[in-house]
Amino acid sequence: MRPRHLLLAVGLAAVWGFNFVVMQVGLRHFPPLLYVTLRFTLAAFPALLFVGGPRAPWRWVLAAGATLGVMQYGLLLVGMRAGMPAGLSSLVVQIQAVFTVILATVLLGERITTRRITGMGVAFAGLALIALTLGDGSPTGAFVLVVASALCWGVGNIAVRKAAPPDSFRFTVWLSAVAALPMMGLSLLFEGVPHLTFSLEGTLSVLYVALISTLGGFGVWGFLLRRYDASVVAPYSLLVPVFGMSCAALFAGEPLSPVKLLAGALIVCGVLYAGTRPAGRTAAAPAEAGPAGPRPEPTGPHRERTAPRPRPDAPDTPDALSRTR
């Protein structure tokens, strides 16, 4: 990866990691379901007027909107409102990668290797360590909600794979539009008619998560995926919890205990081990034109989780929506 693109990938991980602190700030001003509604409404409109159709089967667009939009973010924000710290949330949701592997094996018949089983076991050990050391500051119920959010994320990844969107940014706009109306209904049902007093802090929080993290973030992610294989770009998403926990410690005063650091290392290393091939093991694949000439199409676990490319110039891969943001 070229140096400026590497900086772009690291910067995007920082934006998505800081996003958890921003969401925690937003929850001081808005109920969680209303906050998600505002996020997706602002991300969808007016962009929806300019991007055209989703260019994917509607049943999978609706399924992705329901799981990745309504259920994932609804559960995540309710869990954070219930007491789950921002930094810890950014770490726990990374277990979605493990759920995705399990669901792809069960629902799509993908092959599961010993390496993946080992990596998933290490990641779940880190998750169990967090669960066993939760104190009064992080209620068990809030932890369960965030884990459930990660599970919904895994289900949503399967829907995205089936949708196989050629343009991740356009798909993100439509996903946001699909999620906005159900979230508004759920907010009215469970939180009542809101009595809003817009503050500068709350408004900036909504603008950040909608425009910078969602639209800008996935725009950059798609830009990188158009120039490099998913197996090159995807590992940078593992920097998200690193930035998330660091930003939470720096800006929100969230303590970084040795147990949290150990659990974080187990989850990140487990996910990374399960999602990469051993060094030196490559498979022959047809060449694909790139900015620096022909390059092989991704192989191994990342290739298995990415929908087949119907043509060599497809701009994005559906894996664009399968990483934390």
Residue ranges and their predicted role:
Residues 1-6, 28-33, 37, 53-59, ...:
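Juxtamembrane helix-entry segments on the extracytoplasmic side of multipass membrane proteins
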Residues 10-18, 22, 62-82, 102-103, ...:
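Hydrophobic alpha-helical transmembrane segments of multi-pass membrane transport proteins
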Residues 26, 35, 79, 106-108, ...:
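Hydrophobic/aromatic residues within transmembrane alpha-helices
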Residues 34-38, 60, 88-91, 114-117, ...:
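Signature of the 12-TM Major Facilitator Superfamily
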Residues 36-40, 132-133, 202-204, 238-325:
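C-terminal-most transmembrane helix of multi-pass membrane proteins
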Residues 41, 47, 103, 112-132, ...:
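Hydrophobic transmembrane alpha-helices of multi-pass small-molecule transport proteins
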Residues 43-47, 100-101, 106, 137-192, ...:
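Transmembrane alpha-helical segments that form core, pore/gating elements
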Residues 57-67, 112-124, 142-143, 166-176, ...:
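Cytoplasmic-side transmembrane-helix entry/capping segments in multi-pass membrane proteins
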